[in-house]
């Protein structure tokens, strides 16, 4: 069985521009320095069956929130743009929702976006 969270994470880590950025799932590591940028991948629910045939699920639908945090606003936006292009290349597109804000408590800018996508037919997710 494949795991879409791992697929997304691996795709992001392969990119030369993102390979030195901390990429984690669910939450930003507390041990990361305040000024370091990070990417956090959060599933917004379990995979949903979408294509069915012969009483079987043939494809799954996934929804993820990708949070990019950085000390500089434009750095966070540039990282999020690279994330967007990589996700498009694997069949995910931006959906409604998200956040663009500066948090005084952490002194970081956050650009959080929601992405949706489907597995290919017959892939085992």
Segments predicted by a language model, with ranges:
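Acidic-leaning, charged glycine-interspersed low-complexity segments
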Residues: 81-125
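Oligomerization/assembly interface segments of phage tail-like spikes and tubes
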Residues: 58-71, 108-120
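Small/polar-rich, solvent-exposed N-terminal microdomains that initiate assembly or binding
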Residues: 1-52
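Short, solvent-exposed beta-strand/turn "edge" segments of beta-rich domains on protein surfaces
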Residues: 53-57
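Short, cysteine-centered beta-strand-loop-beta hairpins and adjacent loop/turn segments enriched
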Residues: 48, 75, 122-124
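Mid-chain, well-packed structural core segment of small domains
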Residues: 65-84
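Amphipathic alpha-helical segments
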Residues: 5-16, 80-92
